[in-house]
Every structure is written in C-alpha cells, then in structure tokens.
C-alpha cells in the first residue's frame, strides 16, 4: 500500500495520469468514429474523421446523391461524420418506409451539443428540435388551429391586406434591389406570422422593444449555431477553455440565447396587450396564439406552456416562416426575371382568372399553371435540400441494416427531386410537367393507383415528411402564391440593367438554414396601365376588412 501511495503522489503521476486519461478519451473517440456493426452500407472512412473529408462542404446532398448510385437509392446510405452516425434516405420509397410507415420510431430529433447544452438547456424548448412528447403534440395542435387550412379562411382579410400593403411598399421604393428589396419582402413575410402569434405587425412593435433588423440578426446567428457543428463531430472540442479565444462559440451561444429570450419577451408583451384588450371586451375577431395560451393558462390553470415557452414559440414561428419564405419567393422572382416569356404566361393566367382586377385569395384555386410553377420551384431548387434531420427513438433494423438510436436520418430531398427514374429532364425547369402528371412524374408513369403507391412519390418533399412535416406549409403556400399573383398584376419583374441572373446551383446559391440565391438582383417596375392610385385604393379596401378582424382604430385596439 505504501508503494502505491508513493506512486500516486510522485511528481511523475501528475504527468502520466492526465496523459492516460487523454489517451483513453482519444481511443474512445476514435472507436466512436468507426462504423457500427451492421450499419447501412457506405464509403470507407478514416479513423477519427469518418467520411468527413469526402463530403462536399457546401452542398453535401450532391455527394450523397453520387454515393446513392454506388450503393442504391433504395438502400439507406450509412455515413460517419466524425463521431456522428448519419443515415441518408435517397429515394421517396425509403422516406415513406421509415418516416411515414415507421413514424412512431422515426419522429425524434438528433441530440445536438449546442442546442441541448448551451442554447435551450432545460428551461427553453423549440418545437422544431423537440422529441416526440405530449408537449410537442399539444404545440402542433395549437399551431394547426391558428395556421392550418381552416384558420387560413378566417385569416383571409389579413393575408389580403398585408399583401396589398406590400405592393404599396414596393411602389414607394422603385429602385429597390438586393438587400433593400429583401428588407421590404421580409417585413411582409413576417406580418402574417406576427399578427397570428401576438396581434401586432412587426414594424409596429417598437413600443415593445422589437426591431426587425435586430430580429433578423438574432435569427441568422441562431440558425448558424443550431446547425450540427464541430462539437457534435469531435466531442473533445466541447471542453476547450474560453481563454485565448479557443472557444469563442461559447460567448456567441450565450449571446444568442439571451437574444432569443429577449425577443420572446417582446412578442409576449405584445400578446399581453391584445389579451388585455380582449378581456376588456374590445371588438377583436382574432385571438392570437399567445393571447389564447395566456387565457388558457389563466382559465384552466394549464401549465403545459410556460411564459418562456410562449415567447420562444413566437420566435420560432416567425423565424422559420421568414427564412424559408424569403428563399422561395426570391427564387420565384429570379426565375421570372430571367425568363420573360414564362413570366408573361403566369401573369396572363392571373389576369384571365381575376378578369383583369386585382387577384384575391379566392382566385388561387383556379391558377393551375401558377400552382404548377410553384411546384416546379420546390422540385427544381428545394430550399430544404436535406430537410431537417429525424432520429430513431430506439435501435431499429431495416432490411438487415442496424440503425442505432439517435442516428441523424437525413432525407435527401435534392436527390429525390432530381431523380432521372422519376422525372423527365430533372435538371431543367419545366412547370408543365405538373400539368401533364399531378406529381410531375415522367410521361411513362401512369396514374394507376398501384403504380403511384409503388413510387411513393409526392408533389414535393420540401416541407418534410411523416409526423414532423412542416405545419406551416399551407399558410406559406397561400401567402406566397397570393403575393406572387398580386405582384405580377402590378409590376414587371426585371433584371437590373447590365446584370445577369445566375440560377446555377454551384455559383448562384448559398446553403445556410435554407438554400437561397446569393443575390436578389431583380427590380420591380410598375406595369403599363397600372397607377399608384390603383395600388393605394386596393390597400384601402383590404385594410378595412383587416382592421375589423384585428380590432384596429388608427392602428390601436378599438
């Protein structure tokens, strides 16, 4: 015993024991980067790195698509990114089998270090990253009540007026392009979600401390941090100290967490104002999401959602709606600016259906070619080319392949939407494919029910699949199609003089939280035959109906 004690307290032990611990952790890490037993097939990787250096850093979905040709698109593709297990689904048939038929297992989210340890911790929840639970079920139910298909009808005056307001703002900035045009579009895209969650427009919440510019900065920083990062791939990086700038991300994470909490408080403050007006019996037809939560918390003593959850819910609804909607609408504008004949065809349908008058929401169901254009945009340039990763809640076996619990399951939307097996000329932008076949499939694909079932195809996978499909997809489609129809009625969409529009994936797009164009280099010019008064009159007419729903009088609650 004496000899052992001497070893323990010897000077050499202060070197060797930490070294042994370090070597032990390194060995565990290297073992974790190896492929699990019976893991789905995939390319051989390197110890400590896995397949990390083999995957395209900018557009990883392209690499996965190439590997699918080697291992089969209907076979799950096993990939190792450092210590992280990744399984890629490269066909619609695989998505159906795992995300839809086995939805009870494949509806969780992968554990992510930054999310779970630094930003959300135990007191902050984000529905998009939550595992299946009664909390998530209740959240999605409340969301669908307020933004689902039935709610869209009740909110129609708001969609109409906010889009009419967009036309006026575009008219007031005739040379807006790039970031200036984005700022106008973002205000419009935030309006319906903001009114829906707290009863206030985003540009009229200054008295609650809310500013659109600060919100966008917070949202962008948040999106950067919550993506899988080095701390997930190389766990030892989590323990780096903050001095000498070795873990600068820790300070960023604290700042983002604080900004998300503050923004949620601002939304909640606006909702409390509407709640008070409703309680006073003011004439307000629309009870916002947070106002409803506050009422139920009071009346039912319902503690399912804390006040922090409520504010965080508002932040995520508005943030998600803004980022993806801006990407989709920007792509649509760029495509139409680049192809004047296509633009005129879509406009002609809008004018024919509306009888030359300003198009309204009731016209949307008759805009068949415009909807085909919408579907082709999502097929050709999906803004979520890898979706949002799912994770199995338990170990699972599929066709003899073992998929460990917690594995990141990626739906390769890009590869599915560009499959030569399913689409004629998949690299070409052809809206007519959705007029010839309801799913846009090849001309030799029949409409036979058995054939469609075997193909497992959908119009688009851009909104996700299974139990985690985007609950806001109906609202987004309604809002953006209405916006497109009204913009085409009022404006010509043109490329800036002397500039080319680049729609190439490799040179014209950036992959961040959404796949989006590098630059929104278009300008909107008032069409011949349209006047400023036309647009002002349209907004005045639609605002009257919106004000009645929202209980406004001179911008205040009646």
Swiss-Prot record:
One of its GO terms (biological process) is mycotoxin biosynthetic process. Keywords: Heme, Iron, Membrane, Metal-binding, Monooxygenase, Oxidoreductase, Transmembrane, Transmembrane helix. Heme binds at residue 470. The chain crosses the membrane at residues 11-31. It is an enzyme of class 1 (oxidoreductase). Pathway: Secondary metabolite biosynthesis. Its main location: membrane. It is a single-pass membrane protein. It comes from the Eukaryota. It is found in: Membrane. GO terms for cellular component: membrane. Its cofactor is heme. GO terms for molecular function: heme binding; iron ion binding; monooxygenase activity; oxidoreductase activity, acting on paired donors, with incorporation or reduction of molecular oxygen. Its EC number is 1.-.-.-. Belongs to the cytochrome P450 family. Cytochrome P450 monooxygenase; part of the gene cluster that mediates the biosynthesis of gregatin A, a fungal polyketide featuring an alkylated furanone core. The PKS grgA synthesizes C11 and C4 polyketide chains in the presence and absence of the trans-enoyl reductase grgB, respectively. The polyketide transferase grgF is then responsible for the fusion of the two carbon chains to produce the furanone skeleton of gregatin A. Next, the cytochrome P450 monooxygenase grgG performs the oxidative cyclization to furnish the gregatin scaffold and leads to the formation of desmethylgregatin A. This is Cytochrome P450 monooxygenase grgG. It comes from Penicillium sp. The lineage of its organism: Eukaryota, Fungi, Dikarya, Ascomycota, Pezizomycotina.
